[in-house]
């Protein structure tokens, strides 16, 4: 495919080879109207650089009847002379730039809202028409002022920003300029994207008087705009996190602790514990973190677990997996249940032992008391004799 474009009769033709590099490196200076029109026609859409691998090679320009017709049309529209196509992004005026009317930076009463579709449809107010041809680089909206409209691309690199809407105000984005807030819809697909005329609907919403902003007023993003973009992205990332009620309570505790800077560590702990005991609900811990709730078992699950525990106090891995599938529980839940059940059994056995010992002690005390009473009775009989 590259070899086809590198041939003498490539798709874009050699006027792009000869003059496209001059536009990318040396700017728009010292070019004839025909060379500028050919380079503007041949510049690939949505590309800020030449797609050719050997773009540094200079080749002879071959004129064709098609180039001649394009040159004549450009001379008729933009006027003759080398200064007709010169543009400078750094010297943008309020109303006109180098003889071209800046419709993107006007907030007057006669500026209609421009279409946001492919080539941009004609808007309300005094905006006349929106043209969208197949090979046109972008739609041209001629205002009623009589002055030719400035082309949309300020530099080859800015066209990429125009289609990607990186500058926030490209012709493709929602920009207007009419005082009455006119809404316009213009036909036409994306301009210059295909060889055939595009079909689509573009909708432009007019902004209030003086509120329209120039989409190409700044070729580079300023430091304030970059900082605002970074702040907006960080805010968007922070909004993705889920907020729970306990976060507000925990944040209140931390803010109260930081408010009193003289509180020592121990005093801060006691203060947080007192707040936790008074403000936090039962299912929240002292540090504001959620405690895991108790697992409730159904009667069927408890019965099956008790039967298995009666058979064997310790489960193998295989048996634990089988019971987990049978009772719709996890292995961890069954493991913890058996641990708790063994601890409960141990406590029960210990309690039984203590009861047995207490009974033995009580029986021993009773036997001792009975023996003492019998001895006392026997001693009394001996004294009487």
UniProtKB/Swiss-Prot annotation:
Look up keyword tRNA-binding and say if it applies.
no
Segments carrying the region annotation (Disordered) are 132-194
Q: Give start-end positions of Gly residues composition bias.
A: 177-194
Return the GO cellular component terms, semicolon-separated. nucleus
The answer on whether this UniProt entry bears the keyword DNA-binding reads yes
| InterPro entries membership | Antp_homeobox, HD, HD_metazoa, Homeobox_CS, Homeodomain-like_sf
DNA-binding region boundaries: 290-349
As for family, the record states:
Belongs to the Antp homeobox family.
Q: What does this protein do?
A: Sequence-specific transcription factor which is part of a developmental regulatory system that provides cells with specific positional identities on the anterior-posterior axis. Binds the consensus region 5'-TTAAT[GT][GA]-3'. This homeotic protein controls development of the cells in the posterior thoracic and first abdominal segments. It activates the synthesis of the decapentaplegic (DPP) growth factor.
Protein's name according to its UniProt entry: Homeotic protein ultrabithorax
């Amino acid at each position: 495919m590259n070899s086809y474009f590198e041939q003498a009769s490539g798709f874009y033709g050699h006027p792009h080879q000869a003059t496209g590099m001059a536009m990318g490196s040396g700017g728009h200076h010292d070019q004839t109207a025909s060379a500028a029109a050919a380079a503007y026609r041949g510049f690939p859409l949505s590309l800020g650089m030449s797609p050719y691998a050997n773009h540094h090679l200079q080749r002879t320009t071959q004129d064709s009847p098609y180039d001649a017709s394009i040159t004549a049309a450009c001379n008729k529209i933009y006027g003759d002379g080398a200064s007709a196509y010169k543009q400078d992004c750094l010297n943008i005026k309020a109303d006109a730039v180098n003889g071209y009317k800046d419709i993107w930076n006007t907030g007057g009463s006669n500026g209609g809202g421009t279409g946001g579709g492919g080539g941009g449809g004609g808007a309300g107010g005094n905006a006349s028409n929106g043209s969208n041809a197949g090979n046109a680089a972008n739609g041209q909206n001629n205002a009623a002022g009589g002055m030719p409209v400035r082309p949309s691309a300020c530099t080859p690199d800015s066209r990429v920003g125009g289609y990607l809407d990186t500058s926030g105000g490209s012709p493709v984005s929602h920009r207007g300029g009419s005082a009455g807030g006119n809404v316009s819809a213009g036909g036409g697909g994306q301009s210059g994207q295909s060889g055939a005329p595009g079909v689509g609907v573009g909708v432009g919403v007019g902004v209030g008087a003086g509120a329209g902003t120039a989409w190409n007023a700044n070729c580079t993003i300023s430091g304030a705009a970059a900082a605002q973009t970074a702040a907006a992205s960080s805010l968007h990332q922070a909004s993705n996190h889920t907020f729970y009620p306990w976060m507000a309570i925990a944040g209140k505790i931390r803010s109260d602790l930081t408010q009193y800077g003289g509180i020592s560590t121990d005093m801060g702990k006691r203060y947080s514990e007192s707040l936790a005991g008074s403000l936090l609900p039962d299912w929240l811990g002292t540090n504001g973190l959620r405690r895991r709730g108790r697992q409730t078992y159904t009667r069927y699950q408890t019965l099956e677990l008790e039967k298995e525990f009666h058979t064997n106090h310790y489960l193998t891995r295989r048996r634990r997996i089988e019971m987990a599938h049978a009772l719709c529980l996890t292995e961890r839940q069954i493991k913890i249940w058996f641990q708790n059940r063994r601890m409960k059994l141990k406590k029960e056995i210990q309690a039984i032992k203590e009861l047995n010992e207490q009974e033995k002690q009580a029986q021993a005390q009773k036997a001792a008391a009975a023996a003492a009473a019998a001895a006392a009775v026997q001693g009394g009989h001996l004294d009487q004799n």
